[in-house]
Amino acid sequence: MEEDLIKRLEAAVTRLEGISSNGGGVVSLSRGGDFSSAAGIDIASSDPSILAYEDLISQCVGRALTAAEKIGGPVLDVTKIVAEAFASQKELLVRIKQTQKPDLAGLAGFLKPLNDVTMKANAMTEGKRSDFFNHLKAACDSLSALAWIAFTGKDCGMSMPIAHVEESWQMAEFYNNKVLVEYRNKDADHVEWAKALKELYLPGLREYVKSHYPLGPVWNASGKPASAPAKGPPGAPAPPPAPLFSAESSKPSSSSNQKQGMSAVFQQLSSGAVTSGLRKVTDDMKTKNRADRSGAVSAVEKETRTSKPAFSKTGPPKMELQMGRKWAVENQIGKKDLVISECDSKQSVYIYGCKDSVLQIQGKVNNITIDKCTKVGVVFTDVVAAFEIVNCNNVEVQCQGSAPTVSVDNTTGCQLYLNKDSLETAITTAKSSEINVMVPGATPDGDWVEHALPQQYNHVFTEGKFETTPVSHSGA
């Protein structure tokens, strides 16, 4: 009896393997994912790590989807992509248990399904800026946390899986906090969505990785070689954004290309048929500032004045460590994914002339300075000395560790986020306005509390000296 049963099982497995090798029928799992082997069914139904991942999807991803359905529009669309990415990672986790560890080239092909999903989310943040841009960026940037599955060892260039999830969320949290601040008194559905997104990763994904894969995915040494999943009929290719698992940073945004395009338009106008029939206006044809009138500007003087450019040219983008002591981040335009990951407490960071960019500093540094920047966000961990903001407009700074001093000088518009470990930070301001400080709420789940620093003061001469107090305005 037992021998007959074994033979029937072997025959069934052989038929399933034949179907799989021919690209035929795919076995559908009731709890998600498609796999072309009977082993996939057993793993998905009994393996504790897969069951725990399914619970993560049903609980945490489900909560985010429920909140997104109340909002609708692009927020729901990008949340569905997040759900798709988690489902794709679950499928990869099942396949890893049946697959030998591949080389780097094979790993890229193996992880391509997950990478394709993250590229769809990235595409939603491009083009015309949406009213829900902060939602889209928070969701898109959060997906980089799923790259923990690409960890292959300490020398692979990635942080350990648990640390990678935490570090990846830091960049997403920058935009997630904006959602919380913007909608905290406007729409509870958006606040619920932002909280659900954070809890999906912290503690959700972090605790899952900590419990099941603290050292990365465990491949099957006796399994089959890794290969990319079978593809369907090819569709029309779309221009892809930067991949999730790329070792290089993404290319600059199209803002510089737009500027070059406008310059080309003006150059074409000045050299085309439109202006070919125009005649040069000589001095004797002028009715203003003619050379024969007193007080006229001489041609030599005029040429000297006009030869100087009205604005200084922007230098080339720069992001480098100089002399081993100073990180120089200069002239970065439209770069949302700048990261300094290797730094120490003896180094300083100087950010100059940047616009519409976000920089993340991972680790402790001596001091950080932002100079002449517009619409720049900086997320940092710890500084030993001070964080300085000088000659800036509309900057946002988030401290995730500690900072003894934050100095704001000659700046209009600064949003400063302090965490529970940096509430004793000393903040000094001079010749600045619109300085708002966000601090955590009284409870772990509480909303951020905004405090506007005073920019008007009342000076009264009393008992031989001036006493200065901030001016407070009470609403009617």
Swiss-Prot record:
Q: Which tissues does it occur in?
A: Expressed in roots, cotyledons, leaves, stems, flowers, pollen and shoots. Not detected in siliques.
UniProt feature, compositional bias: Basic and acidic residues: 280-293
Q: Where is this region: Disordered?
A: 224-262, 277-319
> In what ranges is there compositional bias, type Pro residues?
231-243
- Keyword list, A-Z: Actin-binding
Q: Which PROSITE patterns match?
A: C_CAP_COFACTOR_C (PS51329), CAP_1 (PS01088)
Which Gene Ontology BP terms does the record give? actin cytoskeleton organization; unidimensional cell growth
Please state what is observed when this gene is inactivated.
Stunted growth and reduced pollen germination and growth.
Give every C-CAP/cofactor C-like domain span.
316-453
Q: Where is the composition biased (Low complexity)?
A: 246-256
What one GO molecular function would you report for this record? actin binding
| Highest taxon above the source species | Eukaryota
Give the protein's function.
Actin monomer binding protein that accelerates the exchange of ADP for ATP. Regulates the pool of unpolymerized ATP-actin. Key intermediate between actin-depolymerizing factor (ADF)-mediated disassembly and the profilin-based nucleation and elongation machinery.
Can you tell me which family this protein belongs to?
Answer: Belongs to the CAP family.
Description of its domains: The C-terminal domain (318-476) binds to actin.
Q: Spell out the protein name for this chain.
A: Cyclase-associated protein 1
Q: Which organism is it from?
A: Arabidopsis thaliana (Mouse-ear cress)
Its taxonomic path starts at: Eukaryota, Viridiplantae, Streptophyta, Embryophyta, Tracheophyta
What gene makes this protein? CAP1
